[in-house]
């Protein structure tokens, strides 16, 4: 068996992952969705229905977040009014709503969202940065400085 055939990803293509829970933040608050008697993390489909796929694609944090179930997307959303059923909560409050695994992943996602937000410009020269392909880093387009997550 060749090396390529022996490797299988732990997550499916985006189309298969559209209904999987994601970690979306508006500022420092986590987006949650009331679903009957329980509160849950929204899916890409839940947010795409109200914000549009173009808005979500623009807000997606590169690299996603590793979770117990594989890879999940994280989003840094602009402040908008959400429809009934959605709510915004701090992680401290969400601790009482989410299971331990989701809470831990939400904390990691929050850190990654904040890192991405605060590393859009190089700390060495002040120029814009871009996602460095194949890494969890931002690379300065002017001086080449790498800023790792």
Please state what every model-predicted region is.
Residues 107-149:
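Cys/His-rich short segments
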Residues 80-124:
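A gly/proline- and charged-residue-enriched helix-loop-helix capping module
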């Amino acid at each position: 068996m060749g090396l390529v055939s022996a490797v299988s990803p732990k997550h499916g293509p985006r189309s298969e992952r559209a209904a999987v829970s994601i970690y979306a933040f508006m500022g420092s608050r986590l987006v949650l969705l009331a679903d009957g008697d329980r509160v849950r993390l929204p899916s890409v489909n839940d947010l795409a229905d109200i914000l549009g796929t173009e808005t979500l694609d623009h807000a997606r944090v590169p690299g996603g977040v590793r979770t117990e179930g594989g890879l999940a997307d994280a989003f840094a959303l602009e402040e908008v009014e959400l429809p009934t059923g959605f709510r915004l909560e701090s992680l401290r409050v969400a601790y009482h709503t989410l299971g331990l695994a989701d809470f831990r992943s939400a904390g990691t996602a929050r850190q990654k969202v904040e890192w991405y937000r605060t590393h859009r410009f190089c700390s060495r020269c002040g120029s814009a940065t871009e996602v460095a392909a194949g890494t969890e880093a931002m690379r300065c387009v002017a001086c080449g400085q790498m800023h790792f997550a």
